[in-house]
């Protein structure tokens, strides 16, 4: 409920709570990270929503950690919202959607997003970053949602 309120109602007062949790995870597990890449929204979706929650989370983390935010990663094509799509539809929806304007200066980026369902958004963005020269890519998310197509590794 709080994540949806942040994402869709622009209730930024949740930002410090989520930001602190992500910062703790970053400082504990991702000490080799050298920059942040918030999942970009397409310009019309950002205009419609009024902000990008992933970018706001990354700004919070950047301010507290000193890590730079990559400003040249873009979503170049408007896509359907991922909610309600199957895993295959999500993959097709996000194909070739991210691009870099110029060089990637961060070698060990951390993708910042709010919720991961199938992981396809982060997967496609990570592929773009690796193709641009990233050594490895990590992901920081607030929550992992269970999707109908999701099967845990243990098969349960």
Regions inferred by a protein language model and the residue ranges of each:
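PRPP/pyrophosphate-binding module of the type I phosphoribosyltransferase fold
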Residues: 68-156
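Short secondary-structure boundary micro-motifs
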Residues: 56, 66-68
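Extended interfacial segments that mediate partner engagement and assembly in macromolecular machines
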Residues: 1-60, 83
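Short loop/helix-cap segments at secondary-structure boundaries that form the rim of catalytic
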Residues: 31, 63, 104-105
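Short, well-ordered alpha-helices that flank and scaffold nucleotide-derived cofactor binding pockets
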Residues: 24, 28, 59, 63, ...
């Amino acid at each position: 409920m709080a994540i949806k309120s942040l994402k869709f109602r622009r209730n930024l007062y949740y930002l410090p709570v989520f930001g602190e949790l992500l910062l703790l995870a970053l400082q504990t597990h991702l000490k080799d990270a050298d920059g942040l890449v918030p999942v970009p929204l397409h310009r019309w979706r950002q205009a419609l929503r009024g902000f990008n929650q992933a970018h706001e989370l990354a700004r919070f983390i950047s301010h507290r950690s000193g890590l730079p935010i990559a400003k040249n990663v873009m979503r170049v094509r408007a896509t359907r919202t991922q909610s309600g799509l199957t895993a295959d539809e999500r993959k097709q929806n996000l194909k070739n959607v991210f691009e870099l304007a110029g060089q990637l200066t961060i070698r060990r980026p951390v993708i910042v997003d709010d919720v991961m369902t199938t992981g396809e958004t982060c997967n496609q963005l990570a592929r773009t970053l690796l193709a641009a020269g990233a050594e490895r890519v990590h992901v920081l998310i607030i929550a992992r949602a269970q999707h109908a197509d999701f099967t845990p590794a243990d098969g349960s």
